[in-house]
Design a protein with these regions (language model features):
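C-terminal beta-signal and adjacent terminal beta-strands/loops
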Residues: 431, 485-488, 531, 589-620, ...
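Periplasmic-side early beta-strands and strand-to-turn transitions of outer-membrane beta-barrels
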Residues: 115, 124, 142-228
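Extracytoplasmic beta-strand/coil segments of soluble accessory domains associated
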Residues: 24, 28-65
């Protein structure tokens, strides 16, 4: 990745593997990256990358897109031991991923090195009755037969304290200026996942042929809605997922230099939303009988999702300096909804379905080790069918269909100015097709819009990096500037429903202009100490001169887009004491912090009550201690997160957990 012309970095997860961190925690260390969660373990999570967040950033595991795989495989639910490294591509995305991301790509790379046998297992326990466990074992025989099992689980009561306004049931009022310290009481989460693979490796006719099967299950209680004054006492959801998969790789197929990779999977998952309580709750756990059931909307429904995904990647290298890459991704999705409220199940008459095709072709020129250049083109196609409301109160629907087609293109180049000093420049005319959630919602707290349009963006990156070693001293510095001119920007807003209830909705927001920069640095002294940090500033502005719905002047023109952090930083220092107590043992002590500058989650031109909609400055601190024996075979770790007990917020001022303690035991055998 270092010599790649694309704005890309790799996060090595090895330093985190004795910690209780998940993949999203490890990613938060990347420059320009901000992790945004709505609560504790299992909560909704978004990754913000260089000013883009949520659906703008696409997730892959070993190059396979993770759309529609279910919440058990959210990055905040996967243990960090699952990955060997994490690749981050910003803005301009290589053809090989076959995706429509305009914000970037996160690629989780697992360890595929051939090993005779291995076992990696861990268990952790911590605050809020949090239990996490992970096991990965497998074996490769001399005849090439191989198998591997990955399994993990997360459980937490998530019963941490928050400061929230409490509704007075006698008056029916909520004093938003009066905050009471209360304990979350309907927020239990647990998920379990098992991934099994068997196959053949390192044969003349195939380098890797694997058949896999994945099962996952999740249960999630829902404590609050999109605002913290909303309280649920019994609302919850549950679901499961089944996914068979195929993976094929062959280098030098038929002719030298022709490499082919093929993946395919079918994901069938079902999610049930249960909201049938006859009581209304406040933050004290008090309740009162309602006139009709349903805390948000009276429902006991099941959404059955069927998702097919196939990818084909062909690389052809000619005369060492030329590389052609072709990639095609096919994705089909179908959802049917069934109401379970009645004694007889009733299924929606109109199913929701999509067919997405993305093709890409690139050429890479590599005349020397000092520079290389890539040019590429992409074709996007999306067919959508589903219900569209014919009345304003959305009580009548008709089936509608849409076709969307776009062509994108771009180029990327890199040049080593001096030894260790590298420059990168890249541009892409990028498109992002609407996601399933944006078009169809989640059948609960997210409202979809089937008529929403694709986003388009002109993405430009420029980066300089310097890497040098002086004896026992090592220095790495990197700086980058970005420019994004986005049209039909898809924005997540809050919809005010009847009866004081709220949901999220998606709209196209005309034009948005993003400019920003990131700076990162790291210093190491031998094998004893590592210290580094990142700083990010992103200016994401409303670039619409007129209102979306009329020709009237847009009062928010040139104002910052709401609910987007625009300045944040992090730093860390780690000390290593090797051969402590015995040769092969090591004590590691780490400290890290995160700073977030205040931002508004509504437009900054909202009038005199602007302070009510501000997420305040935040500065949190974490510390961890780990002791490894026999070259990492046995490991014990202790962590304290947010040890100064700061009040932390992310999405629409939803409060996260305060000070928390965790411990972890890990064993690792094999080669």
């Amino acid at each position: 990745m270092k010599r790649s012309a694309f704005n890309a970095i790799a996060v090595d997860t090895k330093e985190f593997q004795n910690s209780t961190k998940n993949l999203s925690d490890a990613l938060a260390k990347a420059p320009g990256m901000k992790l945004r969660e709505s609560g504790g373990v299992g909560s909704d999570m978004q990754l913000m990358l260089d000013g883009f967040s949520g659906k703008h950033v696409k997730i892959f595991i070993d190059g396979v897109p993770q759309e529609g795989v279910g919440s058990s495989f959210g990055l905040n639910n996967i243990p960090v031991n699952f990955a060997d490294r994490i690749e981050v591509y910003k803005g301009v995305v290589p053809v090989g991923f076959g995706t429509d991301a305009i914000g970037g790509v996160i690629n989780i790379v697992t360890n595929k090195k051939r090993r005779n046998w291995f076992l990696d297992g861990s268990y952790s326990y911590g605050s809020f009755n949090t239990h996490k466990s992970y096991v990965n074992f497998g074996q490769t025989f001399k005849n090439g037969f191989t198998y591997e099992i990955n399994a993990f689980q997360n459980y937490s009561d998530n019963d941490y304290h928050v400061d929230a306004p409490v509704e007075d049931f006698e008056t029916g009022r909520i004093d938003k200026d009066k905050r009471v310290r209360v304990k979350r009481f309907n927020d239990t989460y647990h998920n379990e996942a098992v991934i099994g693979k068997i196959g053949i490796v390192d044969k003349k006719w195939v380098d890797r042929l694997m058949l896999g099967f994945t099962y996952s299950h999740m249960y999630k209680e829902i404590q609050t809605g999109v605002r913290q004054e909303i309280v649920y006492g019994e609302k919850h959801r549950k679901g499961h997922s089944l996914m068979p998969s195929l993976e094929y790789n062959k280098r030098d197929l038929l002719i030298k230099g022709l490499n082919v990779a093929l993946t395919a999977n079918y994901n069938k998952n079902a999610t049930a939303n249960i909201d049938t309580a006859s009581y209304k709750y406040n933050w004290l756990g008090d309740r009162k009988l309602m006139n009709s059931p349903g805390e948000q909307s009276n429902q006991y429904s099941r959404a059955d999702n069927n998702n097919w995904n196939g990818t084909l990647t062909v690389n052809y290298r000619l005369a060492k300096i030329h590389m052609l890459t072709f990639n095609h991704v096919l994705n089909t999705f179908r959802r049917s909804n069934t109401s379970l409220l009645a004694k007889v199940e009733s299924e929606d008459a109109i199913a929701k379905e999509t067919h997405k095709n993305i093709s890409g072709l690139s050429y890479r020129l590599m005349p020397s080790d000092n520079w290389n250049l890539s040019v590429f083109g992409k074709y996007y196609s999306l067919y959508v069918a589903g219900p569209m409301a014919t009345t304003t109160n959305q009580d009548d629907y008709v089936r509608t269909t849409r076709n969307m087609n776009s062509i994108g293109y771009g180029a990327a180049g890199t040049y080593f100015i001096l030894s260790g000093l590298q420059a990168k420049l890249s541009y892409e005319k990028a498109y992002r097709l609407p996601t399933i959630e944006e078009m169809f919602g989640d059948e609960d707290l997210e409202m979809g819009d089937i008529s929403i349009k694709p986003e388009s963006s002109d993405n430009l990156n420029f980066n300089l990096s310097y890497n040098r070693t002086f004896g026992r001293h090592s220095v790495y510095m990197e700086g980058g500037v970005i420019y994004r001119n986005t049209k039909d920007y898809i924005q997540r807003n809050i919809a005010d429903l009847s009866g004081g209830k709220y949901a999220a909705k998606y709209i196209n927001y005309g034009k948005v202009l993003t400019k920003g920069y990131t700076v990162s640095a790291r210093y190491g002294f031998g094998n004893w100490v590592s210290i580094g940090g990142n700083f990010t500033k992103m200016d994401v502005r409303d670039n619409m001169k007129t209102s979306i719905s009329s020709s009237a002047e847009n009062l928010a023109y040139k104002e910052r887009m709401p609910n987007l952090p625009y300045m944040f930083a992090d730093s860390d220092v780690t000390f290593y004491w090797r051969d402590l107590g015995r040769k092969g043992n090591m004590l590691t002590v780490s400290y890290d912090n995160q700073y977030l500058h205040s931002f508004t989650y509504y437009s900054s031109r909202i009038g005199s009550n602007k302070g009510d909609y501000v997420v305040p400055d935040q500065f949190s601190h974490n510390i961890s201690l780990s002791y490894s024996l026999q070259k990492g075979r046995y490991n014990v770790s202790l962590e304290c997160r947010n040890f100064t007990d700061e009040k932390l917020y992310d999405n629409f001022s939803l409060q996260k957990a305060g000070r928390a303690f965790y411990g972890k035991l890990r064993v690792c055998f094999g080669n």
